[in-house]
C-alpha cells in the first residue's frame, strides 16, 4: 500500500481521472486539482465533455505502437464495463479514400469482433472500407462514473486554477500533469507544442446503433457516434490551431446533410427536418505536435530561483531550500483521449511507481 504517498493529479479530464483511479486502487492518496471538474458538462474550456468517446483507432502499428497498446488495453476495459451500462457495443463502419492507409496496418482486426473489409457496393465510388464491432461511452457520464469510483476510494477533488507547478506541488510527493491544453501556459510546463484542434458536432436523439467514420471525401469528413442513452454525436470538423468556440451555422448544415446520407436512421422521416437536434457543440481537442507526452521528469523547485530571496544567500543555503521533485506528464492525446485513456493511465501508474522506488534525488527522465 502507498497510503502515506500523496499524489496530486492536475486535471480532471478522462486522462487525469483514469490515471487517478488506477493510482487510488494501488493505494496512493490521490487529490485531483482542476479548474474544471466532471460535473462541468457545459464548460468549453474543458475538452472531455464534448468528445464522441468511441473506440476507433487511427494509428498503424508502425506509426504508433505505444498508442496501439493503450487502445488495446482501453478496449478490453470497456468490454468489461458493458454489463454496467457505462459502455455499449456498436457496429462500426469506416470508409477511406484510396490514397489513405485504407486496409493497411489495421492491427485491431485481431481485437475487434466481426472485422471484415467492405464490398465496393457499400462504399462511395473509389473508396474502400471495413466494418467491425466497436464500443462507445457517454463522455460526460463516463467521467462522472470515474469520479464516483475515485470518491469511494477516498480520493478528493479541489476546484482551482493552477498557473504554476509550484502550486500543484504544495503538499504533494508527486504530481501527474494531465492538463491537456493547460500544458501550454502553466509555468514549469510551458509546452508550446500543445495546440487545439477545434471540433464542431451536433448532438441528436436517435436509436441509431451504427458508428460510422467516413473520410472517403477528404474535403468533407463526417462521423456518426451513438452513445449510451439514445444520443448520437454527428460531426465534424478538425481545425488545427483553431481556438474559435462559436457555432458555425453553415458547418451545422454540412454535418447534418452528410450524416443523413451516411445513415438515414438518425432522422425520424429521412429528412434533415426529421433530425431531433439536442445541442450544438464546439470543443477543443487537446493535441500536441509530436504526439502524446507520457513520461516522468525530475524538476527543481522553486522554478525561478534567480528571483527567490534565497538567491541572495550562500549557495549552501539555497541548496537546502531547493527540492527536486517528480512530475509525470500525461497530455496531448487529441481526439484519441478516450480510446487511449485506460492504457495510458496504466503507463502513468507505472511511472509513478518507478518514481517512488527509484528517484532518490538524482535528476533523470523516464519515458515509456
From Swiss-Prot:
Result for mutant: residue 321 to M: Increases activity at low oxygen and D-alanine concentrations
Outcome reported for the amino acid change (mutating residue 223 to C): Increases activity on D-alanine
Residues binding anthranilate 1, per UniProt: 223, 285, 335
Gene Ontology cellular component terms for the protein in this record: peroxisomal matrix; peroxisome
The keyword Signal is assigned to this record: yes
Effect annotated for changing residue 345 to V: Increases activity at low oxygen and D-alanine concentrations
Entry superkingdom: Eukaryota
Induction text: Induced by D-alanine.
Temperature dependence: Optimum temperature is 50 degrees Celsius.
Pfam families documented for this protein: DAO
Catalytic activity reported: a D-alpha-amino acid + O2 + H2O = a 2-oxocarboxylate + H2O2 + NH4(+); D-leucine + O2 + H2O = 4-methyl-2-oxopentanoate + H2O2 + NH4(+); D-alanine + O2 + H2O = pyruvate + H2O2 + NH4(+); D-glutamate + O2 + H2O = H2O2 + 2-oxoglutarate + NH4(+)
Listed SUPFAM superfamilies: FAD-linked reductases, C-terminal domain, Nucleotide-binding domain
Activity control note: Inhibited by high concentrations of hydrogen peroxide.
Mutagenesis / variant outcome for changing residue 238 to F/S: Decreases activity
Subcellular location: Peroxisome matrix
Outcome reported for the amino acid change (mutating residue 19 to G): Increases activity at low oxygen and D-alanine concentrations
Family matches, as Gene3D superfamilies: D-Amino Acid Oxidase, subunit A, domain 2, NAD(P)-binding Rossmann-like Domain
Result after altering residue 144 to R: Increases activity on D-aspartate. Increases activity at low oxygen and D-alanine concentrations. Increases activity on D-alanine. Increases activity on D-arginine
EC identifiers of the protein: 1.4.3.3
GO terms for MF: D-amino-acid oxidase activity; D-glutamate oxidase activity; FAD binding; glycine oxidase activity
Residues reported in the UniProt entry to bind FAD: 12, 15, 35-36, 47-48, 52, 54, 162, 285, 334-335, 337-339
Residues with glycosylation annotation: 177
Motif range (Microbody targeting signal): 366-368
Family: Belongs to the DAMOX/DASOX family.
Name of the protein: D-amino-acid oxidase
Species of provenance: Rhodotorula toruloides
Record gene name: DAO1
